[in-house]
């Protein structure tokens, strides 16, 4: 979402979308899955 693809910038907000951005009534999404170690 910062406009320059994948990079090492720690401030990069990722690839999240807001609710409705991908179609009416679609929930917000993020491809990152959290894992507890």
Swiss-Prot record:
Enzyme class: hydrolase
GO CC annotations on file: extracellular region
Compositional bias annotation for Basic and acidic residues: 1-14
TM region(s), chain numbering: none
Entry GO MF terms: serine-type peptidase activity
Stretches the record annotates as Disordered: 1-37
Predominant place of localization: secreted
EC number: 3.4.21.-
Cellular localisation: Secreted
GO process terms (BP): proteolysis
Subunit structure and binding partners: Heterodimer of a large and a small chain.
Family to which the UniProt record says this protein belongs: Belongs to the peptidase S8 family.
Protein name: Protease 2 large chain
Species: Achromobacter lyticus
């Amino acid at each position: 979402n910062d406009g320059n693809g994948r990079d090492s910038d720690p401030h990069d907000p990722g690839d999240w979308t807001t609710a409705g951005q991908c179609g009416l009534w679609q929930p917000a999404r993020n491809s990152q899955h959290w894992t507890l170690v």
